Amino acid sequence: MTKPALRSDIPMKPTVHKQEKPSVAFAHLGCEKNRVDTEHMLGLLTEAGYSVSSDENDAAVVVVNTCSFIQDAREESVRTLIGLAEQGKELIIAGCLAQHFQEELLESIPEAKAIVGTGDYQHIVDVLKRVEAGERVNHVSEFPTFVGDETLPRQRTTDQAVAYLKVAEGCDYRCAFCIIPKLRGDQRSRPVESIVTEAHQLAEQGVQELILISQITTNYGLDLYGKPKFAELLQALGEVDIPWVRVHYAYPTGLTPEVLAAYREVPNVLRYLDLPLQHSHPEVLRAMNRPWQTDVNERLLDRIREQLPDAVLRTTLIVGFPGETEDHFNHLAAFIERQRFDHVGVFTFSPEDGTAAADLPDRVDPSIAAARKDRLMALQQPISAERNQRWVGRTIDVLIEQHNPETGAMIGRCDRFAPEVDGEVLVLPSEKGLQASPGTMVPVFITGSDVYDLTGQLVDTNAMAVTAQTSQ
């Protein structure tokens, strides 16, 4: 891994002291956990009376919430920072890149007026006030311990009907390839009551889909209660008036019989399992420092299908890990072909300084790793197409997210598709010309499918919020 290539030729400008509070904009990069942090900073600044613009061009200060998970993410973050600096914007750099390279950023980008760590974003108002006073601020805790909760102001950036809820922060696992524990600290779970309170708040805002996130969501509560309490959390969220509760990052070790029973018994918990398995071969898993998984994968998947026969299964995989041979890869390909996941994401290995994998021998040539990724995705595509085709001829609920008033066409998602990472449903007006507004959940008859998406037609019913198609 190389450190981000930062520019050092931007001339330092004197800080201008103003009577009025500066206008602020946000640039959000990275994962949905980072998004929640951005939303809290937005809420805090708005509550403090700052003018927050959705357009970076209209703002004097831009808060850039960065990602540093892999090299590509770092490069995107640096490109964003340099582009804004060249526009003359004053920058507050937050997030994982700030946690990772705080000194380098301050030294190389004069426009960087403040650095805010992953465990320090709750201080964004104080940081901005210090910047206004002419101070250059480095507010980064070496060991992040903070986790936001329902008492922290929040201004959501997602569609009105979708919200992410962070149940814990940080990670206690030490996978050889992952830098996250060094950037976000050890696991800190929120109390069940705190999470449920925020879920009720989101329900009152009209949220239809609640997505639970953390680094290891199924290990929720282990640090706080001495044992995982994820099953109890799901049961408690069953009392919240939100139709869909989706779980991301369901690690295999946490999918106990009690948790699977909660998936089965709690009506609003979607039977959608996002399983970051990473690989199938025992030798690669040991090198990844995930040896416990060797005997788990097959047995776990069998148990899921036995208890949740209609479950939607997604997994993410890494190819090109140091020492991965062609035999190892073929083992993984056979595993994918045998298990027939609904959705698969494949990443090539990215060496990260500070991780055990960065020093491993037998690096796989990047061109070989890229070819393996392509081969695995080509193998998965007909499987995904087959899994989608099963829904043709059925009527399913679809959450509408976009609507074209000129054509009447709508785009939404059914419960088998998570936002951003999975497919969509193209919805045509009903036979009577009815259309649905974004944010509504409606019945759709599925008429077609492909590798990633479904196509359907709105079903005529008096039980849904619709608008009549305007005659041209």
UniProtKB/Swiss-Prot annotation:
Substrates-to-products reaction catalysed: L-aspartate(89)-[ribosomal protein uS12]-hydrogen + (sulfur carrier)-SH + AH2 + 2 S-adenosyl-L-methionine = 3-methylsulfanyl-L-aspartate(89)-[ribosomal protein uS12]-hydrogen + (sulfur carrier)-H + 5'-deoxyadenosine + L-methionine + A + S-adenosyl-L-homocysteine + 2 H(+)
Top-level taxon of origin: Bacteria
Record's cofactor remark: Binds 2 [4Fe-4S] clusters. One cluster is coordinated with 3 cysteines and an exchangeable S-adenosyl-L-methionine.
Pfam families on file: Radical_SAM, TRAM_2, UPF0004
Domain MTTase N-terminal, residue spans: 22-133
Binding site for [4Fe-4S] cluster 1: C31, C67, C96
Single Gene Ontology MF annotation: 4 iron, 4 sulfur cluster binding
Subcellular location: Cytoplasm
Biological process (GO), any one: tRNA modification
Gene Ontology cellular component terms for the protein in this record: cytosol
Domain Radical SAM core as annotated: residue spans: 157-386
Transmembrane intervals: none
InterPro entries the UniProt entry points to: Elp3/MiaA/NifB-like_rSAM, Methylthiotransferase, Methylthiotransferase_CS, Methylthiotransferase_N, Methylthiotransferase_N_sf, NA-bd_OB-fold, Ribosomal_uS12_MeSTrfase_RimO, rSAM
Residues engaged in binding [4Fe-4S] cluster 2: C171, C175, C178
Function: Catalyzes the methylthiolation of an aspartic acid residue of ribosomal protein uS12.
Family: Belongs to the methylthiotransferase family. RimO subfamily.
Protein name: Ribosomal protein uS12 methylthiotransferase RimO
Species for this entry: Prochlorococcus marinus (strain MIT 9313)
Lineage of the species this protein comes from: Bacteria, Bacillati, Cyanobacteriota, Cyanophyceae, Synechococcales
Originating gene: rimO
